[in-house]
Amino acid sequence: MQQNTRYLFASEAVSRGHPDKACDQVSDRVLDYCLQAEKKCKKASRVALETTIKGNVVGLFGEVTCQKTFPTISWFRELVTEIGYSREDLDLDPTTCSVHINVRGQEAEIRGVVHNQERAAKETLGAGDQGLMFGYATDETPERCPCLWFLLRRFKLALRSKFEEARKKKIELAVAKGIKVSQVDATPELRDTIDFWWLHTDAKSQVIIEYEDDSGALKPITARVAVLSVQHSKFVTHDQYEDRLPQLVKGVLDEYGMHSEATEYLINIKQKTSGYGWTVGGPNADAGTTGRKIIVDTYGGHGAHGGGAFSGKDPSKVDRSAAYYARYVAQNLVRAKLCRRVLVQVSYVIGKPEPLNIYVNTYGTGTHSDSELLEIINKNFDFRPGFIIEELDLLNPDRIKYVETAYHGHFGRPEFPWEQEKTLTL
């Protein structure tokens, strides 16, 4: 790309109530459940779990070796409530939804190839599958993540906060009045006392930013388009919320200097252009499946993706652990100012601890050549799965709650160990 070239780039995000993202949360909550049991009995759990939801049905499929009885149907229904679905909102009903479980233990042949259930043998723990994984970092933000990704995450957090505040107040009002929560929405004198009363849990957003390419490094200039679509109550009209949502989005863009007079806001554009609202969302509107939002989960289209999803997989699966480690490597290279932007690739074959290759590309922004940076990587980082798990403490349920990665993204969040600083030997 030519020096100082300007271009437009788009990324998208979805809320916790989006059906695909809800499935990620269910799969990762089961993983957390198993790892907590593992902590107590000191035996390795192996989890590869897919969740599918549609209508009022939750399906779980996969292989789980856990030292504790598999969660009950009531446990899953509580999780559905936590995600934000409710009968009143025409979503998955946590009081009546059926839960179908088709899960068995990890296949013996895979277990034999990968490990011998010896957690101490970190040198011999093989990769859980073949594949390629990527880590990416950029100096656009203090979090060393793309600016677009960061803005979209802030949108999600702001929407979730408004949704949870409104839901709490509606429940309190319903209890005080002795009525159903749905009746609060239907009663103007009650609902009008609650800010964002009409907001439901399913939502999608998209932002287009004008970037300047500065000799391989990326400089965000301004947001050109901000798109937000939210599920809402059937009792609200577009006119009633068309000011509130743009204010919320603009507030985030203003905070990071990304709003300009040229920024176009497209808010629930379907209702504005066609007259049809978005009152039916979640799994009633669309089926959801674990692992279908892999770009949302990573860098929003920047960098690259090897194709393997994260959620529902224990750390022996390099789809997850090696992608976290590649991010750990990338963000530490940028943090150490060895480059301004970098992509790291690693690949494996099942059963073999050592990676087949490690690749680094600094897009011409490095203070060293890419081959010299590769030497620095090999000197400071060990990509064998057992060492990854140990260094990042990936089996410690007190350190990591994997369901939290499914909430609002896996990267750029300082509470996760793969985002921590490592002092490098040059």
From Swiss-Prot:
Keywords: ATP-binding, Cytoplasm, Magnesium, Metal-binding, Nucleotide-binding, One-carbon metabolism, Potassium, Transferase. K(+) binds at E50. Strain xD contains the sams gene. However, due to infection by bacterial endosymbionts, it does not produce its own S-adenosylmethionine synthase but is dependent on the bacteria for enzyme production. Catalyzes the formation of S-adenosylmethionine from methionine and ATP. The reaction comprises two steps that are both catalyzed by the same enzyme: formation of S-adenosylmethionine (AdoMet) and triphosphate, and subsequent hydrolysis of the triphosphate. It comes from the Eukaryota. ATP binds at H18, D202, A203, K204, D286, R292, K293, A309, K313, K317. GO terms for molecular function: ATP binding; metal ion binding; methionine adenosyltransferase activity. Signal peptide: none annotated. This is S-adenosylmethionine synthase.
